[in-house]
């Protein structure tokens, strides 16, 4: 077997499905490995993090094969793989992790110390994350397979819920991580900034964790309408009514117990005029304002160290005008960084299989073909309330 196709980044605003190399049992530096498997990709999703690159807001190089949200079938394995068999259906955490370093042993798999020579942390198909080939493709190599992969135990039942299980690679654990690190528990009042897929996953996770009320804020009316239809309260950030007043109208007080930033560095201002302009510190500053004293703020939204398209010189190197003094005065706790998917994915798999969470409906999963990926990128960038899931082999599109 030698054919393969994938979604390739061709520069700002452009992706294309091209022929790419069939995966080999070797790492990005050409070293042969025996701890990996080759997957036939069953599903692979378009993520907001991919959009940051496609918009030209990172230093991603032309020719990068995109995609880090992957579910697949094991079709080849190295000699050192002991716990997986040919034919197994597996969920792939977006983190590439060795399982051997200090970070991995402490389950900080988002900052593995060995898989990326440039910095801590690796991922598939992402800028500065170790040059691991992306999974928006027909076939993919996964290293350290015994450690990284989550086997889906009942293939037939898993395929019945593949639209939900495909979210286990990233957005559901990422949203859940945001809710957990924000301290969400039974009876919590929660504000989630961002009604995209990660924000909705955070909102659904907060509900799973027992939150009394979840408010989702956004500028996009279609996404707000979708969030409302899923049973969440909403805050329309395009209005001139300040966020704390909208929260007070819902809760009777202007603050929440817990807050989640599911927007990240491409945030825009609030209000009729503010929404017209990018203002990368907006979300963090607003969360400090509306989170009660001693509250927690989870920050799964992506922030970068290099942003070529930033609004000013400071933001180009990830330096933002944050009112940290306000957070200090209110004794806030902040939690940032890449989600350690493996910390949560098995429990969330069970929640899906036992109908405790219907994440595909919440985030608006729409299945498309690999050839339709460029269209999916365009529509997602336009702000439609959908989560595009690519089915490269037409395995379940008609299911």
UniProtKB/Swiss-Prot annotation:
<keyword id="KW-0862">Zinc</keyword>
<dbReference type="InterPro" id="IPR036291">
    <property type="entry name" value="NAD(P)-bd_dom_sf"/>
</dbReference>
<protein>
    <recommendedName>
        <fullName>Glutathione-independent formaldehyde dehydrogenase</fullName>
        <ecNumber>1.2.1.46</ecNumber>
        <ecNumber>1.2.98.1</ecNumber>
    </recommendedName>
</protein>
<feature type="binding site">
    <location>
        <position position="68"/>
    </location>
    <ligand>
        <name>Zn(2+) 1</name>
    </ligand>
</feature>
<feature type="binding site">
    <location>
        <position position="198"/>
    </location>
    <ligand>
        <name>NAD(+)</name>
    </ligand>
</feature>
<feature type="binding site">
    <location>
        <position position="300"/>
    </location>
    <ligand>
        <name>NAD(+)</name>
    </ligand>
</feature>
<feature type="binding site">
    <location>
        <position position="218"/>
    </location>
    <ligand>
        <name>NAD(+)</name>
    </ligand>
</feature>
<feature type="binding site">
    <location>
        <position position="223"/>
    </location>
    <ligand>
        <name>NAD(+)</name>
    </ligand>
</feature>
<keyword id="KW-0479">Metal-binding</keyword>
<feature type="binding site">
    <location>
        <position position="112"/>
    </location>
    <ligand>
        <name>Zn(2+) 2</name>
    </ligand>
</feature>
<feature type="binding site">
    <location>
        <position position="270"/>
    </location>
    <ligand>
        <name>NAD(+)</name>
    </ligand>
</feature>
<feature type="binding site">
    <location>
        <position position="268"/>
    </location>
    <ligand>
        <name>NAD(+)</name>
    </ligand>
</feature>
<feature type="binding site">
    <location>
        <position position="263"/>
    </location>
    <ligand>
        <name>NAD(+)</name>
    </ligand>
</feature>
<feature type="binding site">
    <location>
        <position position="339"/>
    </location>
    <ligand>
        <name>NAD(+)</name>
    </ligand>
</feature>
<dbReference type="InterPro" id="IPR007698">
    <property type="entry name" value="AlaDH/PNT_NAD(H)-bd"/>
</dbReference>
<comment type="similarity">
    <text>Belongs to the zinc-containing alcohol dehydrogenase family.</text>
</comment>
<comment type="function">
    <text>Dehydrogenase that catalyzes the NAD(+)-dependent oxidation of formaldehyde and acetaldehyde, and, to a lesser extent, long-chain alcohols, but is inactive against propionaldehyde, butyraldehyde, methanol and ethanol. Can also catalyze the dismutation of a wide range of aldehydes such as formaldehyde.</text>
</comment>
<dbReference type="InterPro" id="IPR013154">
    <property type="entry name" value="ADH-like_N"/>
</dbReference>
<feature type="binding site">
    <location>
        <position position="337"/>
    </location>
    <ligand>
        <name>NAD(+)</name>
    </ligand>
</feature>
<dbReference type="GO" id="GO:0018467">
    <property type="term" value="F:formaldehyde dehydrogenase (NAD+) activity"/>
</dbReference>
<feature type="binding site">
    <location>
        <position position="101"/>
    </location>
    <ligand>
        <name>Zn(2+) 2</name>
    </ligand>
</feature>
<feature type="binding site">
    <location>
        <position position="47"/>
    </location>
    <ligand>
        <name>Zn(2+) 1</name>
    </ligand>
</feature>
<feature type="binding site">
    <location>
        <position position="98"/>
    </location>
    <ligand>
        <name>Zn(2+) 2</name>
    </ligand>
</feature>
<feature type="binding site">
    <location>
        <position position="49"/>
    </location>
    <ligand>
        <name>NAD(+)</name>
    </ligand>
</feature>
<feature type="binding site">
    <location>
        <position position="52"/>
    </location>
    <ligand>
        <name>NAD(+)</name>
    </ligand>
</feature>
<feature type="binding site">
    <location>
        <position position="104"/>
    </location>
    <ligand>
        <name>Zn(2+) 2</name>
    </ligand>
</feature>
<comment type="subunit">
    <text>Homotetramer.</text>
</comment>
<keyword id="KW-0520">NAD</keyword>
<feature type="binding site">
    <location>
        <position position="170"/>
    </location>
    <ligand>
        <name>Zn(2+) 1</name>
    </ligand>
</feature>
<dbReference type="GO" id="GO:0047895">
    <property type="term" value="F:formaldehyde dismutase activity"/>
</dbReference>
<dbReference type="Pfam" id="PF08240">
    <property type="entry name" value="ADH_N"/>
</dbReference>
<dbReference type="InterPro" id="IPR002328">
    <property type="entry name" value="ADH_Zn_CS"/>
</dbReference>
<dbReference type="GO" id="GO:0140087">
    <property type="term" value="F:acetaldehyde dehydrogenase (NAD+) activity"/>
</dbReference>
<dbReference type="Pfam" id="PF01262">
    <property type="entry name" value="AlaDh_PNT_C"/>
</dbReference>
<feature type="binding site">
    <location>
        <position position="302"/>
    </location>
    <ligand>
        <name>NAD(+)</name>
    </ligand>
</feature>
<dbReference type="GO" id="GO:0008270">
    <property type="term" value="F:zinc ion binding"/>
</dbReference>
<keyword id="KW-0560">Oxidoreductase</keyword>
<dbReference type="InterPro" id="IPR014184">
    <property type="entry name" value="HCHO_DH_non_GSH"/>
</dbReference>
<dbReference type="InterPro" id="IPR011032">
    <property type="entry name" value="GroES-like_sf"/>
</dbReference>
<feature type="binding site">
    <location>
        <position position="48"/>
    </location>
    <ligand>
        <name>NAD(+)</name>
    </ligand>
</feature>
